[in-house]
């Protein structure tokens, strides 16, 4: 199913595992729990990766939309 808007894509991904790339070069991989109109997201069972390598595991993370690429 194709999405016309970014929020539609996020809504379709709710409850699924996603990767979020951050401006600082890190990637967060986790299950999308919630989001808002500013693209702030809440992820569960998060893994933080740097250059593809696992750095650490984080339980739940709130990610500000302005830090996401």
Where are these predicted regions, by residue range?
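Conserved RNA-binding domains used in RNP assembly and mRNA/RNA metabolism
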Residues: 1-69
